[in-house]
From Swiss-Prot:
Domain of life from the UniProt record: Archaea
Protein name: Elongation factor 1-alpha
A Pfam family of this chain: GTP_EFTU
Gene Ontology cellular-component annotations: cytoplasm
Amino acid sequence: MANDKPHMNLAVIGHIDHGKSTTVGRLMFETGAVPAHIIENFRKEAESKGKGSFEFAWVMDNLKEERERGITIDIAHKRFDTAKFYFTVVDCPGHRDFVKNMITGASQADAAILVVAAPDGVMEQTKEHVFLARTLGITQLVIAINKMDAVNYDQKRFEEVKKELTQLIGMVGYKAAEILFIPMSSFKGVNISKKSPETPWYTGPTLLEALDTFKEPDKPTDKPFRLPIQDVYSISGIGTVPVGRIETGIMKKGMKVSFMPANKDGEIKSIEMHHEEQPQALPGDNVGFNVRGVGKNDIRRGDVCGPADIPPTVADEFTAQIVVLQHPSAITVGYTPVFHCHTAQIACTFVELRKKLDPRSGQTKEENPTFLKSGDAAIVQIKPSRPMVIESVKEIPQLGRFAIRDMGTTIAAGMCIAVQPKQMIR
């Protein structure tokens, strides 16, 4: 099935229980991506387990264990079409310990829907997700003020939440004037695909119309091919099949490739997308590909595939610009948290704190600071504990952004501004 519409990867972000999965389920239902009889089956099953309101969210939660726990765990790729685009949803789980999934999910997204429940307004994770979306390079955002049915579609409450959100997104550099705020109810289907009489005071677009205001992402096809691996399968009769999303460049059948830092070479035998074989694939495409000459155990999640003649850069050390989101005390030289960069998760050490910056202007405030605390921006030198692929944001921004986590929370986020490459023996 060739799809002539441009493709967008869409992250759905926001605090736990604000209705992210229900919103995705409703979008898929309203666009015909989920047949009505399947929704009906989900509804019956949900009612029998005492979770009547979960009917649309269950479209996403098609894993048994998740259904019973009532939460969405791993990132689920689902697709639906609007008039202008076809979207692949990168569903970003909302529970506290899943922020790292949010990081790897958001780094694959071209745009995001921020879901905020009208009764609660801005919550802790709303802030964290907005900050991460911005740091990870998501420039396009639609804000869904959800659960309006729970506040009787009150315009005053909508305006209060909108004001709160306008301040929050302004702090991280989004321009509120360019962002659409939609009063809606995913559960009731209000303002998703058609205007609702419940909100006569609202004259703006529906959620689906708002998604079509996004600008088509530039496809960085002129850059070297890069694909961070999400999973590796071994399929009988076919062989080794890595899966991932192309970040830059063009992937072609017959191409000679290198996997780094595994330092393994192979050849692409076939490429599959949405269960159909393709001769080539472009940035933004989620693909599985069969590779000759590489065993399942030779490569793993976090490795990056690139052309054999321009392999991905493996860092010995790298220089980064970071913003500290929250740290219980202070970051000093020697601190070794976990860096989440594309699909890799690697412990890295702060070997030098070069300068503290003014987070708004980027001007240097202090040379060689002794520590960094929450709210500080800085230029730092980092040494990975084992080989990792990271690229300068000037060269390949998609592989230059990262989040730093420790003790189950996101400590900081940042980008790589220079790499001291490790010499790989070929």
